[in-house]
């Protein structure tokens, strides 16, 4: 931990949030047990990662209760402090959010990973209406909104635990405010309070089961197939090459959302595992796909397109993999999305600094396998995170190509707002690094109802029945996890 003198020196350099860090051994705990001890209440989060579908990433992140958060819906933003609105803004929320983030000047913590606090949460799909370069082409008609969640919700994370899964150590991070005369002392006291919480045992909430329920499609199979045929008509007319319609399913779910996270992380380990408690609703997900990642001046997108079910035996698994890589339709769709990713990254990158690294590799998850590629670029000077978001949002894999025309068609054919689905979840650090996953393989739990949404890439030779089945396959991991909870994880 830095000394009072070091703290004062950093304050003199103009930093208005200064991290105090304490390192402890926590090798007898897991990220889940630590979350139960330190957080497990509204406006907290747990973020984990599984690399290559096989091993947990080095770091996990637990956000302690956030006193400040922003909610944006339409052209209005509310800033909350301890549950009370303390600031409001009318107009495009994105410049306001960027300015809010930029209020905080913090030194880096060299010994820790790139994320050690900042804005954490989501940008829902309807954020599209705030990007001026294509919003004027979208009608933004009033649609049904079964979930009723904000378009954007971001927490200001100033107290967190960074878990090093390799060493078994936990790094407690509390930001001190040097504008307060006793800011340093208050942060030290807060660290001691958190240490006390760690020493206490926590009650493990057992999942003993509940009544079994079935997921019901909002769209319905036949209307969805008709939607696929309508999109094919647009494709044959030359309007577009691909569109990704989606359908939402819902089911009664009265169990703990944290139990759902336990089941999902076991059933479908993914590069982005996340649990957000927003008070009146929860987001639980295991997304395989980056929307965009910024690390200093490098930017990465990672398109995923092309799907097969996992085989029941190694031989069947290999056969499915070979079948996927030899499927001309799937390869053509994936190449189109690589080109879209190159175009998106190229808008914000220096000339000649965009490259495809991993190209058409297979990644395997619990229920499905995908074709994946990596597109990287070196940012132009002066690019902001909102410039990056504007260039990459929404993902081509969730919209289609050309992107804007595909979004117009989605707006026409889908019956309700997408909400969180198809948007982005993740972190925007104080250091301006950003790591956002696409909100897929993601459940929203609200009012004892679980919602999950999934899409299918429709091209000229798509079969409506196959595209309907693809949406079922993609939602299967979340629905199976919910049914595991209903059967009882701890019986």
Swiss-Prot record:
Binds 1 Mg(2+) ion per subunit. The keyword Amino-acid biosynthesis applies. L-tryptophan binds at residues 49, 271-273. One of its GO terms (molecular function) is anthranilate synthase activity. Gene3D superfamilies: Anthranilate synthase (3.60.120.10). GO terms for biological process: L-tryptophan biosynthetic process. It holds the Pfam family Chorismate_bind. Its cofactor is Mg(2+). Chorismate binds at residues 306-307, 421, 441, 455-457. SUPFAM superfamilies: ADC synthase. Mg(2+) binds at residues 333, 470. InterPro entries: ADC_synthase, Anth_synth_I-like, Anth_synth_I_N, Anth_synth_I_PabB, Chorismate_C. Feedback inhibited by tryptophan. Its EC number is 4.1.3.27. Pathway: Amino-acid biosynthesis; L-tryptophan biosynthesis; L-tryptophan from chorismate: step 1/5. It catalyses: chorismate + L-glutamine = anthranilate + pyruvate + L-glutamate + H(+). It comes from the Bacteria. Heterotetramer consisting of two non-identical subunits: a beta subunit (TrpG) and a large alpha subunit (TrpE). Part of a heterotetrameric complex that catalyzes the two-step biosynthesis of anthranilate, an intermediate in the biosynthesis of L-tryptophan. In the first step, the glutamine-binding beta subunit (TrpG) of anthranilate synthase (AS) provides the glutamine amidotransferase activity which generates ammonia as a substrate that, along with chorismate, is used in the second step, catalyzed by the large alpha subunit of AS (TrpE) to produce anthranilate. In the absence of TrpG, TrpE can synthesize anthranilate directly from chorismate and high concentrations of ammonia. Belongs to the anthranilate synthase component I family. NCBIfam families: trpE_most. This is Anthranilate synthase component 1. It comes from Neisseria meningitidis serogroup B (strain ATCC BAA-335 / MC58). The lineage of its organism: Bacteria, Pseudomonadati, Pseudomonadota, Betaproteobacteria, Neisseriales. The gene is trpE.
């Amino acid at each position: 931990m830095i000394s009072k003198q070091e703290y004062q020196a950093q304050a003199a350099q103009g930093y208005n949030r200064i991290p105090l860090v304490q390192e402890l051994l926590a090798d007898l705990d897991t990220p889940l047990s630590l979350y139960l001890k330190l957080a497990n209440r509204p406006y907290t989060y747990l973020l984990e990662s599984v690399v290559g579908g096989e091993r947990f990433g080095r770091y996990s992140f637990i956000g302690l209760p956030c006193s400040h958060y922003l909610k944006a819906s339409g052209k209005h933003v509310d800033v909350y402090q301890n549950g009370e609105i303390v600031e409001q803004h009318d107009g495009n929320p994105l410049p306001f959010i960027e300015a809010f983030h930029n209020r905080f000047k913090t030194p880096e913590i060299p010994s820790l990973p790139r994320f050690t606090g900042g804005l954490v949460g989501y940008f829902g799909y309807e954020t599209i209406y705030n990007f001026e370069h294509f919003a004027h082409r979208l009608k933004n008609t009033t649609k049904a909104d079964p979930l009723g969640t904000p378009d954007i919700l971001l927490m200001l994370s100033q107290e967190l635990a960074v878990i090093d899964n390799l060493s078994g150590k936990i790094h407690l991070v509390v930001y001190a405010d040097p504008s307060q005369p006793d800011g340093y002392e208050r942060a030290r006291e807060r660290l001691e309070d958190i240490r006390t919480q760690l020493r206490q045992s926590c009650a493990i909430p057992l999942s003993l089961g509940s009544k079994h329920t079935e997921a019901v499609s909002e769209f319905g199979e036949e209307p969805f197939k008709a939607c696929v045929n309508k999109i094919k008509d647009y494709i044959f007319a030359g309007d577009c090459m691909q569109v990704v319609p989606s359908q939402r399913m819902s089911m009664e779910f009265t169990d703990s959302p944290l139990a759902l996270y336990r089941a999902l992380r076991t059933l479908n380990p993914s590069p982005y595992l996340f649990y957000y408690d927003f008070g009146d609703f929860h987001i639980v997900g295991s997304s395989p796909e980056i929307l965009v990642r910024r690390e200093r001046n490098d930017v990465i997108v990672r398109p995923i397109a092309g799907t097969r079910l996992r085989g029941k035996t190694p031989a069947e698994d290999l056969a499915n993999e070979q079948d996927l890589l030899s499927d001309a339709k799937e390869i053509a769709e994936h190449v189109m999305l690589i080109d879209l990713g190159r175009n998106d990254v190229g808008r914000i990158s220096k000339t000649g600094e965009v490259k495809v690294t991993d190209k058409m590799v297979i990644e395997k998850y619990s229920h499905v396998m995908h074709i994946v590629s990596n597109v990287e670029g070196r940012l132009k000077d002066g690019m902001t995170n909102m410039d990056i978001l504007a260039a990459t949002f929404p993902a081509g894999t969730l919209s289609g190509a050309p992107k804007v025309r595909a979004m117009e068609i989605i707006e026409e054919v889908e019956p309700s707002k997408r909400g969180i689905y198809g948007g982005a979840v993740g972190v925007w650090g104080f250091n301006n690094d950003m790591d956002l996953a696409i909100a897929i393989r993601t459940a929203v739990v609200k009012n004892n109802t679980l919602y999950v949404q999934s899409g299918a890439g429709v091209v000229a030779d798509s079969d409506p029945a196959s595209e309907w089945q693809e949406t079922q396959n993609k939602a299967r991991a979340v629905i199976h996890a919910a049914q595991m909870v209903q059967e009882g994880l701890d019986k």
